[in-house]
Amino acid sequence: PFYSSLNGKTQKIDLTYLINSNEIIPQLLKTEIFNNKNIDFKLNIKADSIRNNFNFVNIVFNSKIQEALIDIDNSKLEWKNFARFNISDSLIYINDGQIILDGKIKIEIIDSNEIYKYLLTPKNYRKNLNTIDMGFSYNFDEKSMSLKDINIDKIYNENINKIINKIILKDNNLQNRIYLKNLLNEAIKSYAG
């Protein structure tokens, strides 16, 4: 059996080594070398920010390989002072030769007014938000993410989920921002009633 645990702290973390499918870590995952019940490996990294992205701070990246399963449960980050994100029930696996990350995200809203300002949401639709829970699936090779099963303040809304299920984020950051803002505002309007 192989047991190891690595902990580290840095000012900035470069996530391209973890999420770019051509980098060494994703390539190792594709070999399925970690699908071994004798490997028990934990990697925990804390960072003040993400390289080339000043919006996200206080990153805690926790990864674990145990019993041939790979997850990033309890990984966290903050979007400025607006919201905190926490990942749970995650699993990284290979499907048809592609690396997939499935999981759940809990978003704790710190300042909903700042989020509404960022989204340019009309004032008459701005309701106070506390938490958002949702499922997600990220394909490392296609650089795409889909969202599902959204609950706002522990309430499931069919209309919001129909809108959120339309969200598929691709690699183009500018297009994603505009597309995401428009769809999120559509969901907020539905939530506001």
Language model regions located:
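Membrane-proximal interfacial segments on either side of biological membranes
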Residues: 1-193
